[in-house]
Amino acid sequence: MLKKPSGREADMPVDFLTTEQVESYGRFTGEPDELQLARYFHLDEADKEFIGKSRGDHNRLGIALQIGCVRFLGTFLTDMNHIPSGVRHFTARQLGIRDITVLAEYGQRENTRREHAALIRQHYQYREFAWPWTFRLTRLLYTRSWISNERPGLLFDLATGWLMQHRIILPGATTLTRLISEVREKATLRLWNKLALIPSAEQRSQLEMLLGPTDCSRLSLLESLKKGPVTISGPAFNEAIERWKTLNDFGLHAENLSTLPAVRLKNLARYAGMTSVFNIARMSPQKRMAVLVAFVLAWETLALDDALEVLDAMLAVIIRDARKIGQKKRLRSLKDLDKSALALASACSYLLKEETPDESIRAEVFSYIPRQKLAEIITLVREIARPSDDNFHDEMVEQYGRVRRFLPHLLNTVKFSSAPAGVTTLNACDYLSREFSSRRQFFDDAPTEIISQSWKRLVINKEKHITRRGYTLCFLSKLQDSLRRRDVYVTGSNRWGDPRARLLQGADWQANRIKVYRSLGHPTDPQEAIKSLGHQLDSRYRQVAARLGENEAVELDVSGPKPRLTISPLASLDEPDSLKRLSKMISDLLPPVDLTELLLEINAHTGFADEFFHASEASARVDDLPVSISAVLMAEACNIGLEPLIRSNVPALTRHRLNWTKANYLRAETITSANARLVDFQATLPLAQIWGGGEVASADGMRFVTPVRTINAGPNRKYFGNNRGITWYNFVSDQYSGFHGFHGIVIPGTLRDSIFVLEGLLEQETGLNPTEIMTDTAGASDLVFGLFWLLGYQFSPRLADAGASVFWRMDHDADYGVLNDIARGQSDPRKIVLQWDEMIRTAGSLKLGKVQASVLVRSLLKSERPSGLTQAIIEVGRINKTLYLLNYIDDEDYRRRILTQLNRGESRHAVARAICHGQKGEIRKRYTDGQEDQLGALGLVTNAVVLWNTIYMQAALDHLRAQGETLNDEDIARLSPLCHGHINMLGHYSFTLAELVTKGHLRPLKEASEAENVA
């Protein structure tokens, strides 16, 4: 069902070109704006001198217009009637020509146009599309096609821009599209060839066996390997390790893949994971082998990550179960403990009687409590009383039976490595790898460095022997902590590898060092940075202290053990009658719309569906693809599945078409690009610009129950009850658009938000440039404050108890008046000086995308013994957190702004909840990719709703002004596009639009349509 060339212009292929690209290539699509007229059609004195050589006004105007056209369009026009009137008048005025109708004479002789084109090419050094320019463009396109999987439409735009930049006359669209197709095909064939040559003959035979059934299942081995773990248990871990081992045994992991483009490998592997075994078997031998190699290489890493995720989750379950068992034991033993404590208290009271002689105390105590009874009480207390640092390790040791089911697989299969801080854990791992298969009950020669004080009594018995059970559980507890800090890591794993190895290093760091310092805006001398911070902090302390007496919202409370500030809650803003009236008028004007039509209408405005391209055949286009894409997005976002949207009599909505579209077009990269289109379009709307400039955003999580078995979910009784769930962490700009070019991050359970704040900010791909991020308390930590400052961002969380926070000072002797009592923390700038270059190297690595922010932050946050780098980042974070706190208590408008932005995020979540109405709003995808794709679709559809509302609210405002209404700018700034009562998300789903709406026109506002009796 590939598109055929248009009958209107058969020489222009539209296999991959959008309608907009077809209509705009070498043509005017409307009147150029003032900036474009000034840039491309302005004639300087040299131009006028050249033009003056032509005889007659018609020739002078004609050649002048051709000069402007070749600058603006990249080519000459044969029909001057296609030049907009504004361009003709603008050019004629510069030449002093009053009557532009003389232009009709210019088109009478074709030779004149040809001669003028030749003169312009010669005078302005324009060139035909020929050698060496064909070679240079081909080389550029080939390089881009080789390293990335860019859509051919993007390559077409790139090629057009490159040709115009180098003053090459645009060739026919057919020539350019054919060149792009040939180049992309050549790059693809090269990738297939290189991948197919990696395996040996024996390995190729083994890879072909992936397509055949396994011994114990009708499924092919490939299909079996696609299925990751869905439960958290010892057997599930063993199966996950066997899955990784099967992929690892192909022996492809050791090959040098540094010369192959990572993005294209990833896309090819994803395609292998989505398509059927039948489709792979039908491929050419070279492509089939390339797909299988890419699958094994990618899934080997994924399988190892999955196995380690199961291990981490399983250890967490063991610890949680041990805690539950311990707490139950504690409750059952409380009566005995209370009884024994009272008896001991009575016995000890005899020791305090002054009248009893020392030599008689023992006899008097035993007269009250017999010696044997007292010994029994003491024994009982020792058994059931727990030290203050108890972590239910006794109950963990009781879980040994669960551990021994999976530990041999762990020790014998996974190869751990370590940083210096993890050497002791690695030594213990190596020891257990050698000794665990023995039947020894005591490991007296085991490394003891991992045995902490709280574990000692459980690991070392009364006879001073190191017990097998105690040591094993102690090791697993230490291993989990070391893995989470990445002191111990697994080479070959993406999520559990060594983040330090991904930082800028060696020659790479030295080559980029000065650029990184400049881009981050920090001086190379740490003393300069510290001096600047010290000046800011000192002046801010003094300003806030001077105004504190006038600040009625803040009081200094000295009644407690430590002085603290109390901050009055913000009073709700009154909603004036004018705002209520304006909101009501706009609400009444918004026309009702089905969500299906809304998506198609937003596509007519933005063309977001053009960002969806086939996973392996990017040039493939089918008729009415936007309809199919909108249907699939609707199915995912509304959580209703494809079934309600299938129409057997509509080619774009058949079961086969929708399944094919979902499998080949819906994925993170396409959703991200489409989402960026919506966000960028929203930023151009005048109403959105009134709400904000895109410099501010908030981050928050939206919780979803996951009732299916999956390892990518976690427990939290507050949000999920007795179930498990996930958190969709997403960002909302001050223009109400949701972003992170990334559509959101899916987090198992409710992990700390602070781990993911920076990741979303750094990876977002929209045109917005947020520099200030607002979060709830959960997203705040000294480390995050420090990283934000290093990267040049302002972190503005809403702290639950800001007045009780520690305020830090840099000058120990400075007098801050009434704030002296709360400025208790003393920062240590020496730590910053010692680690300054390392701090900037880390920040630069994050900025350049060398390391994933969540991985790095997680490893830094988990450390019980922070490294010098972590301490330095925390130190600079404390200073910046204090600057934030001083601003927070001093400026009510600042507090109000934070609250307003966070409320926008919560209101947007309410719209998303309304959209995701199917299956009780529960996410039933088992694997991370499926969860991310579905919630990405939800974010995209939510953005479409926000954009549609903004467009029609703008139209409603224009309508009200035209009717003579006086509108208050302050009221307009408080309007919100987060409404959905007029949008139908249920019932019969229709994907048809009125012709005018399809062409980008707005549907009538409700009031106007009722007046004209338009449905």
Swiss-Prot record:
It comes from the Bacteria. This is Transposase for transposon Tn3. One of its GO terms (biological process) is DNA transposition. Keywords: DNA recombination, DNA-binding, Transposable element, Transposition. It comes from Escherichia coli. Coiled coil: none annotated. Disulfide bonds: none annotated. Required for transposition of transposon Tn3.
